[in-house]
Structure formats: C-alpha cells, structure tokens
Amino acid sequence: HQDDQIETFLIRLSRGSGVEGLSSMQEMITLKNGTRLIRPLLDFKKIDLIKIAENIFGKTLKDPSNKNKKFLRTNIRALKQNLENKGINIEKISRSIKNIASTKEAIDFYVAKSIKKFVVFENKKAILNFVKFQNEPLEIRFRIMNSVIKNISKSYYPPRSIKVFNLIEGFQRIRIKKCTLGGCIFEKKKNFLHVTKEY
C-alpha cells in the first residue's frame, strides 16, 4: 500500500539510492523465473485498507514486529509520522515517487537501446565495446553494467552501487584489467570488456 511505498522510498533515500532505488516498488515486475508480481494497492492508504478489511471480515490482524524498534522500517515509519505531524504532505511524496518512476522508465528505454548498440551476448558471455561505452553519461554506464551483470550472473539483485561505480572507474582509468564482481569475471581486452559467469 501507499504507506509501505513511502517507507521504502525513505529507507532507500537514507541509503543514498539513485533513480533505480528511489523509484521504489513497481506495480508490476517480472521475476527471473518468468512469474509476474503485481502490486495493485500501491495507491491505497493503509488506514483505508484496514477500514475495508474490518467492514468485510470484521477484524484485522496486527504484526507485533511492526513495533520492534530494532528494525529500520519501524523507525522509518515513526519518522514518516513525524513528517506528517510537521505538515509534510505525504501525498506529494507519493507523487514524487511516481515522477522518479517515470524518469526510470525513460532511462530504461535509453539503456535498452544502448545495449543493443554496443553489447553482444553470446555463449553465456557479454562483450562490451568499451570505447562507445565510455561516451555514455555516468548513469547510463552504471545501468548498462548492472544489466550485463544481472544477465550473465542470473542474479535478481545487482551488487551495491558503489562497487559498480568503482568497477567502471577502475577500467576507465586502466587501474585494473581483470576482476570479479556480482558473480561475474570482467576482463579488458584492447577496446572490449569481456564478461563471463564466475561459477
């Protein structure tokens, strides 16, 4: 629901996430096994869903862990309440999340076109034209590298952002010629970066 969405946004904001993370939860995603995960209630407030559930079922269940302060989400929930008490409009935060998600969609479109231009996937390996890659904006380079890592390693989650940025910078500054990250082996051969599965 909307409250979960805003909490997810604030958690990722506190971790320094970029567009990918700040776009928060998507209404529909396809998992790596092909299953579609649909979240139809992201625009509904928790309090409204509770009222509907109580009206239909007569009661609702409460998760006691929601009050456990050792969990980050519990503390973020308290922060969200404080923001509301201070006059921050939660609906506008929700609108900002949608705007960021729209930006992510535009970047995804450009990244997909760029990958077709200078990344070749063959025999469980990716070969990236590093000269063309370097001409792209940093955010696009980051997203392309994430996409390659996920495609080759078959992992749902990519490595931490800072590690991917360091990888890109290392190869651009010719500090490294071969390394591993996110279940992949990266090796620079002349103007091309070869990416294979680590294990």
Task: Name the predicted role of every residue range.
Residues 14, 29-34, 74, 78-79, ...:
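AMP-forming adenylation/ATP pyrophosphatase catalytic core
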Residues 3, 7-96, 129-130:
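Catalytic subdomain that performs nucleotidyl-dependent activation
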